[in-house]
Structures are given as C-alpha cells and as structure tokens.
Amino acid sequence: MDRKIRVAAIGDNCIDYYDSLNESYPGGNPVNIAVYIKRLGGESSYTGAVGTDSFGKIMISAIQNKGVDTSHIQVLDGKTAVTHVDIVDGDRVFGKYEEGVLADFKLREQDISFIKKHDLAVTGIWGMIEDELPLISKEIPVAFDFANKFANPIVEKAIPYVTYAFFSFDEESLNEFRQKYHSMGLKEKENCTEQLKEFMKAMQQKGPKVIIATLGKNGSIGYDGNSWYRFGIIECKVVDTMGAGDSFIAGFLYGILNGLNVQDSMEAGAQNSAVTIGYQGAW
C-alpha cells in the first residue's frame, strides 16, 4: 500500500460536547473519516461549513492539525453545529443536537470541481449533498454512510449514485428497518439477519458495487452482488465508541482504494475501529 490515495469527505461536522466531563471534541461523520484516512497514510480533504463562533475556529484548526485539506470549508455567519454526548458504560449516548450553520450548507461549483480531483468522495445521511451526487458520481466513486436511517427518503434518492453503501444495523433502528423492509415488499424471513441480507441484496441492485452493514459488536456483513462476506471485531479495551463506525468506513475504503478485496477491506475496517475505541473522543 504505497500509493497515496486521495479522499474527499463532504458534509456535516459538529463539536461533540461531553456534558458530564465538560469537554468538547471536533467530529462529525465526514470529518472523522477524513482524519482517519490521514491516520492510515492517505491524503484527504474536508468540505463543509462552520460558524463564525469559537467552535468554528476550533474545528478548522483541529482538522488542519491532522493534515487534512481545509481549503473548501465555508465559514458562514452563525453557530457551528454541536452534539451533546454522554458516556454510559463505555457507550456514547446522544442528547440534544444544534444544527447551526449546517442548515445553510450547499456545495458551490468550485467545491464540486475540487471534489472531482480526488479518488473517491465520501458523505452521509446528514451531509445534505444528495442533489449533487449525480454530478460527482459521473467522475469519481461515491461512498455513502446511511447510518441506521433505513426509512429516510434520502436512501432511495442517493443509492443509485453510490458505489460503496454503508448501513448500521442495531436495536435502536429495528422498527425503522422493519418499516422499510415491508414497504419494499420483500419476502418474510425467519430472523433479522436473513431479513437484513434480503434488504442488502435489494439495495445493491439499485446501484452500489458493494453494500456493507455494520453490526456493532457482531462485526459486519458485506455483499457485492455475487458473494457474501462476514468479519467479526478485533478484541480490544473499549474506552469510548465515538468514531467506531467512521473508523470502519475509513479503513474499508482505504483498503479498497489500495487494491484489497472486500473481505480484507472489512478486516482493515475492523482493525481501524479497534484503534479508535481505545481512547476518548473520535480522534
């Protein structure tokens, strides 16, 4: 893996504020992925929006200090997004979310031209760039983190333009998953795993080259239209699960872009997650 791959991370960012600790950490799905790509040895950029408050300056400075290209961050009048977080038994629990200036974020022509110069673009369900995906996907592959928002309308809107699709399957999203599953008219299956696989097959046929479902402590499942893949987790001490999913995505994409197959890329994702959950905060 000696080729310097270049990944454009686009969309939301937020300050993760731990109320009980009175500590704040810069983060957000695409921001985290950009930082992890750098940690793995690649090149990355982040395109998004921050406010004119102190958190905006902290966000830009923190990303720059990790070596990520911040030349296309928009500074908009207002407040930077904040997510309130707490730690309960090693797991993060989300509280109030304040969107701030992200509500006004939109890609400009110069941003799209910049993004197209990368090897891959990665964004997510809160990235607000689904309207630009047809343009971007004509030039470079797109990775999209749909998180556990199975029934969100953005899923159907974005999926045809996505090369690598990621979903997160957990107890919290079980009802939403079943709602989406039945709305698609898919066959009843004997258990959740079989239903998830049926869903993944249906989604993969809508456009993605590969679809991955992360299962928390149960590892991940992958499907490429021909074969199924499964990988567990790398055992490690859990300090904070913040960034675990984003670490997996970054590790997987870094592996794929450097020529690894799906199975080995899933292992690379798990290894990267194990590093991240061993310390406080996403990075």
What are these model-derived regions, one by one?
Residues 4, 15-20, 24, 42-120:
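Conserved N-terminal subdomain of the carbohydrate kinase-like
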Residues 6, 119-120, 164, 210:
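Structural motif
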Residues 120-198, 217-220:
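Conserved beta-alpha-beta core of the PfkB/ribokinase-like small-molecule kinase fold
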Residues 1-6, 180-283:
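Conserved phosphate-binding/catalytic region of the ribokinase-like
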Residues 115-116, 159, 205:
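A short, aliphatic-rich alpha-helical micro-motif
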Residues 6-12, 143:
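Short, hydrophobic/glycine-enriched beta-strand segments
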Residues 12-13, 126, 247:
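Active-site metal-binding loops of divalent metal-dependent hydrolases
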Residues 30-39:
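Histidine-anchored nucleotide/phosphate-binding helix
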